[in-house]
Amino acid sequence: MLIVYDHDADTTVPVVERLVPEMPQLRLERNELGRGVLNAIRTGFQVARAPFVLVTMADGCDEPEAIDPMLARARAGADVVAGSRYVKGGGQQGGPLLKRTLSRAAGLSLHRLGRLPIHDATSNFRMYSRRLLDGVTIESTAGFELALELTVKAQRLGMCVDEVPTMWHDRTAGQSRFRMWHWLPHYLHWYWVAFGSRRL
């Protein structure tokens, strides 16, 4: 399990270092590509050697019980497996109402009108195949829109895109770095690209 951090002052580092003797599967990896969520994820992609790579934020909002079903779908041939809040068995607890509404509307419209095979377009809780990661060039410049970019590109390449239900729980400690009006234009770019997606 890779824990990617930006700088040595990150308070996550000493916590993970204390856990390593009990959990030797944990591995700290410093992000040398530049600060921010995008480069942290890119660092993880570069360092990971497994055939499938799961991305999850370290805020405890994503449901770890969904990981095994996601891995099963990936092993069955999916190149993208999304943890979806908007299918039967999934859901969301907490979070700003406007953010929830826009997220659900984006997922519904992309699924029904843009023919994206998943219902949750904005969650970053996703598993990717190494085949996909090695076969595309990342164009995202901000960060959180990366999941939508990779999903759209997988669809355009004719790869398998799947989803499993998951619950998202709003964080109980700390402060989110997600600022909707900052990230929205970056999401919108890939939102419109998705509507033009056709198999290559």
Locate the predicted segments by residue.
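Short beta-strand/loop segment that forms part of the nucleotide-sugar
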Residues: 1-8, 27-31
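Hydrophobic helical membrane-anchoring modules
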Residues: 5, 21, 113-115, 139-200
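A conserved acidic beta->alpha catalytic loop
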Residues: 5-13, 60
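Alpha-helical transmission elements in cytosolic ATPase-linked domains
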Residues: 11, 15-18, 43, 69
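Terminal low-complexity segments of carbohydrate-biosynthetic enzymes
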Residues: 14-15, 75-76, 131, 189-200
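Short helix-capping segments at alpha-helix termini
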Residues: 20-26
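Acceptor/aglycone-binding surface of glycosyltransferases and processive sugar-polymer synthases
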Residues: 29-47, 52-55, 64-144, 170-181, ...
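Residue-level signature of catalytic and energy-coupling elements of molecular machines
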Residues: 44, 59, 129, 154, ...
